[in-house]
Design a protein with these regions (language model features):
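An acidic- and aromatic-residue-enriched active-site/binding cleft used to recognize and process polar
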Residues: 19-24, 54, 106, 131, ...
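Terminal-proximal interaction/regulatory segments of ATP-powered molecular machines
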Residues: 182-270
């Protein structure tokens, strides 16, 4: 405001440039109407130049980063890539999954969406791929935590949970993350396999609104196949978790959900 009202503005031109993680109006999206109007006045002093990476661009950046890291490809890479092609997942990133190893195809689809919705876009993306923070790609490799050489979806859950303090998500999106986080935090007496199921479903739920992936039994069976204990198959685990209230199945959408609530947005209506 001081810059705008300066008497010598014409003689001393000055441009203020800011880089935002969200659209300008999104920072006040969940505020009261009065604050939104005041925020709109501030927005009126700026000119927006929106920029959003395409899935192809993001996939290319991920592939180049992984190429520089020279990470060894999993032994069953060809088999997993063929399965991804059979499930018609290739178009999600407009890129061959071969270039994204050791990210499991579903992990490669989820990662950009999580970074844009719940992180800080490319900053979060490159931090996961290139840093040595706990739960990052390098940390998983150094601690021999990969699953048959793959970074799995539940690895992403653990990493983003640890770095949740740096999220720039909209309050409405952040609330959904908190709901899932609270649900899993309060889950006691579950096996490691059951926790992996819930973490995977939780991430699918967070990204399903963008059409990326949905937590149906076909995708869950594929991504959890290598982890399924012989004495406790996935179908039995899903039935047990549903009966104990940890998740629910929505038949009309063919999707498992961590939260029980409906799609009705009470906050928006109020």
């Amino acid at each position: 405001q001081l810059i705008e009202q300066s008497e010598n503005r014409k003689q001393k031109p000055l441009a203020l440039i800011t880089l935002q993680h969200l659209a300008f109006e999104d920072y006040a999206a969940d505020s009261a109407a009065l604050r939104q109007r005041e925020w709109a006045k501030i927005q009126g002093r700026f000119r927006d130049f929106p920029f959003s990476d395409s899935s192809r661009t993001t996939g290319f950046l991920m592939a180049r980063c992984l190429q520089k890291l020279a990470v060894e490809q999993p032994a069953n890479a060809s088999e997993v890539w063929a399965q991804a092609n059979g499930l018609e997942l290739v178009d999600q990133l407009s890129l061959r999954f071969e270039a994204l190893a050791p990210l499991h195809p579903l992990t490669a689809i989820l990662l950009p969406d999580l970074c844009s919705k719940y992180g800080q876009h490319e900053r979060s993306l490159f931090k996961f791929l290139g840093s040595s923070d706990e739960g990052s790609l390098q940390w998983l490799i150094n601690n021999d935590a990969l699953v048959d050489g793959w970074v799995m979806p539940w690895h992403l859950y653990d990493y983003f949970l640890a770095s949740a303090g740096s999220t720039s998500a909209l309050p409405s999106l952040a609330q959904r993350w908190i709901e899932i986080q609270t649900r899993l935090r309060d889950a006691v007496g579950l096996t490691g396999f059951e926790l992996e199921i819930l973490k995977t479903i939780g991430l699918f739920n967070l990204c399903s609104s963008s059409g990326a992936v949905r937590a149906n039994q076909q995708l869950l069976a594929w991504v959890l196949d290598a982890r399924e204990p012989e004495a406790y198959p996935l179908a039995s685990a899903l039935e047990q978790l549903s009966s104990t209230g940890f998740m629910t199945y929505r038949g009309q959408a063919d999707e498992y959900r961590i939260w029980r609530g409906s799609d009705f947005d009470l906050g928006e209506q109020v």
